[in-house]
Structure formats: structure tokens, C-alpha cells
Regions:
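Cytochrome P450
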Residues: 1-424
Length: 424
């Protein structure tokens, strides 16, 4: 089922809106988002699942919605039954346990969990992990650079963050391929209610629960051990909370980085002048353009298209529209980050853009806790690729590329590339 924005009866001159959520939209949603920003910035639509929700597309409205605590993250506040039933693919007996994490709860529970998790997932821990991210990046490129061709999604963008977060969590190396298989099942099917997804989630949950149980008796220098150690005035994470947090750090943390790398390389292919600037900067031993460039890639075609669900707990007005209690609200980060009222020439990729307070990792109390790790991985992956494979290019016409369906994430299914083989 697709949504087409109707003409406004009060304004017959307004043309019918674009069709949303079809194949053409998935390939390039930005013209549709531009139309919505201009004509229906807060727009009620029927999603492919049948659920009706408000899409928020302007930057100012998006920041308001992301920070407005009248919009709850708890699905129990949804007025309708369809989404509240939660087609998550998570087995029913474990659903409540795994869904109790930072993305789905509100203060004061959110405040408590965020404070405890922040004591473990620190900027210092991310900085100390940088050399290992570089080693993983070099290892993965080394596996295909002698061939002269690769699928950058399956051979690089996907395994890098899954292995990185596994190592940071403390998953033994001999078990990491299991996580790659489980994560691959979930990313291919978008977390939908399919048997393979449910089995993968169940297996991942069981493994994490057992790993946390073992680590309580043998704490190490890893993130799970630090989650167990984390204390705030005598308060600790329960085993169920630690399991849920490890699950969401792994699942949410890897897919966003897959898409950051894939979308970022694609954007550089489509904007060769910016790619040349970046390669010249890297060749000169400079890092500044890489750092601002990753921020611009997050704004221009970021990994998260829509923020996760919010539900009105009280009546409110957003962008001139009355939002009723129980209404779902989806903030379209991809649309807000192309808003000409906020960004000069928003449809132009400018790797040196300085005024770039994008919403790629959210805003407010739910700002992405893993953003520093994702930035590190994105900078390391893109910088190393461009230095080691300087003539990297698409191996297929851009029109042959296919984007994954789904509501929240934006990413390519495959990214075939070719380059001069390296055997040194």
C-alpha cells in the first residue's frame, strides 16, 4: 500500500503530492520530501503496514519533536492496535525484556538507564578502540584488494561494524561469525516478523544472556564487563537490562554504520569533485576535511531516514497541525537535513560545510549514544578506502543499484566496485 498526498480541498491549486514508499521513492526520496516540506510539512499518512502516522519534515519542527517529552517512545501510548502489537520478530516470551532499552522508554526510567550505560560507553573507551578499528579496516580491505573488484556492502561496510562492536562488547572471536549471521538475517528482512528473524533474535538474546552471566564471575576489559560494573549510588543494571542494552548497542550500532559507509561511498561516487577534494586532503596528510566530510555525508544522505517511533501522550500542535493523544509521530531526519530554511544549498554535497548541526544522530535526550563510535568507524573506513584504493569506482551503472526497503534505515543492498588490484 502506498500513500499519495491528496490535493488540498482548501487550495485546489496545490498539485497532488508524490507517491511515498514505493520503489522509486526508496531509490531517491528527496524530491518527495522537498514537496512535503513545502506543501505539507507535518503530514498524516498511511504507512505500508497500514498504520497511520504523522511525518515531520521541516528542520525546526523536527528538532521540536525530537526534544518534546509529550512525545513518548513507549509503544504502549499508541492509540491504535496495529503497531502496538509490535511486529518485531522478537519471540513473545522475551519481547518485553529485549524491548526495554533506551530507544523505547521515557524518563525517569530512561534517565536512570542512560546514566548507567554512559558510565560504561565512554568517549575514552571509543578513543582507546581506534587502533583496533584501523586494524579491522585494513584486514577487511586486504581480503579483496588483490582481486580488483568487491561488493563493498557485504565485504566491507557490513562486517566492519559487526566485528568492531562484538570486540568492544567482549564477544570471543570464535563466536563473532555467529553474530554476523544473526545480524545479516535481521538486516536482510528489516526486523520483520519472519521465522528466520525470530530465530536469530532468540539465539542472539540467549547468547548475550549467557555471556553476561559468565562475565559476572570473570570481568574483563570490555563493554559488557563495564555495563556490569556500572554503578550510580548503589544502583546497577539488572541482568535483563544489561542483556537488552547489549542487544540494542549491537543491533542499532552496526546497521547505522553499514549505511554510513555505503551511503557515504555512494555519495562520493555521485559527487566526484568532492571526492577529489577529499583524496587530495588525505594525500597531504590532513584530517580536517575527512572529519567535516563525514558530518556532511551524515546530513546529505545519512544512514537513518526516519527517527524511531514517538507517540503523543498529550494533545500538541506541531507545524500547525493538531496531534491527538495516541497519534504516532515519525520525524523524517532525511527531510529535515535537506531543509533550505536551515542549510544553504541543502541538495549540494559540501564536505567542508561548517554550519552543520544535522540531525543524523537525533537530538535531545535520545541522541544516539553510539555516535562517537560510528563517527570513528566512518572516518576510518572512508579515509582508508580512498587512500588504499584511489581509483575505486562503481562497477555497475548507478541506476542498477538497489536500495533496501524499510521505514527507518536507508541503505544499499549491494555496492559493486572495481579498482586496480593491489598485491603488495
Amino acid at each position: 500500500m502506498h500513500d499519495q498526498s491528496p490535493a488540498d480541498p482548501a487550495d485546489p491549486s496545490r498539485p497532488p503530492g508524490p507517491t511515498l514508499f514505493d520503489w522509486e521513492f526508496a531509490t531517491d526520496p528527496y524530491p518527495a520530501y522537498a514537496w512535503l516540506r513545502e506543501h505539507a510539512p507535518v503530514h498524516r499518512t498511511r504507512l505500508p503496514s497500514g498504520v497511520e502516522a504523522w511525518l515531520v519534515t521541516r528542520y525546526a519542527d523536527a528538532r521540536q519533536a525530537l526534544a518534546d517529552q509529550r512525545l513518548s517512545k513507549n509503544p504502549a501510548h499508541h492509540a491504535g492496535p496495529a503497531h502496538a502489537k509490535g511486529k518485531t520478530g522478537i519471540p513473545g516470551e522475551r519481547k518485553a525484556e529485549l524491548m526495554t532499552h533506551l530507544l523505547n522508554i521515557d524518563p525517569p526510567d530512561h534517565t536512570r538507564l542512560r546514566r548507567l550505560v554512559s558510565k560504561a560507553f565512554t568517549p575514552r573507551r571509543v578513543a582507546e578502540f581506534a587502533p583496533r578499528v584501523q586494524e579491522l579496516t585494513d584486514h577487511l580491505i586486504g581480503r579483496f584488494e588483490g582481486r580488483g573488484e568487491a561488493d563493498l556492502i557485504h565485504e566491507f561496510a557490513f562486517p566492519l561494524p559487526i566485528y568492531a562492536i562484538c570486540e568492544m562488547l567482549g564477544v570471543p572471536r570464535e563466536d563473532q561469525d555467529d553474530f554476523r549471521d544473526w545480524a545479516g538475517m535481521m538486516i536482510r528482512h528489516g526486523g520483520g516478523p519472519r521465522g528466520g528473524v525470530a530465530r536469530s533474535v532468540k539465539q542472539m538474546r540467549a547468547y548475550l544472556g549467557e555471556l553476561i552471566h559468565r562475565k559476572r564471575d570473570d570481568l574483563g576489559n570490555d563493554l559488557i564487563s563495564d555495563l556490569i560494573r556500572a554503578s550510580d549510588h548503589g544502583d546497577h543494571l539488572t541482568e535483563a537490562e544489561a542483556t537488552a542494552m547489549a542487544f540494542i548497542l549491537l543491533f542499532a550500532g552496526f546497521e547505522t554504520t553499514v549505511n554510513l559507509i555505503g551511503n557515504g561511498v555512494h555519495s562520493l561516487f555521485m559527487n566526484p569533485d568532492q571526492r577529489e577534494r577529499l583524496q587530495a586532503s588525505l594525500a597531504a596528510g590532513e584530517s580536517g576535511l575527512l572529519e567535516t566530510g563525514v558530518e556532511e555525508l551524515l546530513r546529505y544522505d545519512g544512514p537513518v531516514e526516519l527517527a524511531t517511533w514517538r507517540y503523543a501522550t498529550r494533545p500538541l500542535t506541531l507545524g500547525g497541525q493538531a496531534i491527538a493523544v495516541g497519534d504516532p509521530v515519525l520525524v523524517v531526519l532525511a527531510a529535515a537535513d535537506r531543509d533550505p530554511e536551515r542549510f544553504a544549498e541543502p541538495d549540494t554535497l559540501d564536505l567542508s560545510r561548517s554550519d552543520n548541526q544535522h540531525l543524523g544522530y537525533g537530538h535531545g535526550i535520545h541522541y544516539c549514544l553510539g555516535a562517537p563510535l560510528a563517527r570513528l568507524e566512518g572516518q576510518t573506513a572512508l579515509g582508508t578506502l580512498l587512500k588504499r584504493l584511489p581509483d575505486l569506482e562503481l562497477a555497475v551503472p548507478p541506476t542498477d543499484l538497489r536500495w533496501r526497503g524499510g521505514l527507518i534505515m536507508r541503505g544499499l543492498r549491494t555496492l559493486p566496485v572495481r579498482f586496480t588490484p593491489r598485491n603488495d
